[in-house]
């Protein structure tokens, strides 16, 4: 199916981000059972893989979106592939992903691009795309700082038999790709974003602060 091939291509382009995350445990949420449960490219010892079925998540465990059966602060990577769009409570699901992350842990979130050409394939299915600006607000409110974000995936999922590879497109055209990737890191305990203030005093040899 064209949609599945599009999702695999989006995942393929996100692999470089996976290789930057190390640790013991990861959590992988995918939009359907048809997608492979293995998270290709990850550098973790083990990954709990769940998929969307109706309004719940199933797989190695079964749960509601707002009650992931994972202890707080135990996951090095939370990888969510197009599951916010199908969630009955996307903001609550994001809150759960933030909860299970260790301080310094990484959330890798891939959402459908609400302005991409490929939206014509899924908009009629009742999926509600998450605006990247809104997603950024949700992350900030849950102690996650965005490190990188970009558009990725193909412009359009072509018919079966067509080679689906990334086409060179940047600038304004990049915003027409199928997906949007956000890499966010959970703030270390006790750290808050710095506010702009007076420049720090620079001491020269022989000077003291007092």
Positions of PLM-derived features:
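Class I SAM-dependent methyltransferase SAM/SAH-binding core
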Residues: 12-68
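A short acidic, Gly/Pro-enriched loop at the edge of an enzyme's catalytic core
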Residues: 66-78
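A short SAM/SAH-binding and catalytic strip from SAM-dependent methyltransferases
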Residues: 76-89
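A short glycine-rich, Lys/Arg-flanked "PGG" loop and its adjoining helix->strand segment in the class I
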Residues: 91-106
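Conserved class I S-adenosyl-L-methionine
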Residues: 106-134
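Short alpha-helix
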Residues: 126-153
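C-terminal lobe and adjacent flexible extensions of AdoMet/dcAdoMet transferase-like proteins
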Residues: 142, 167-210
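Conserved catalytic loop of SAM-dependent methyltransferase domains
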Residues: 147-179
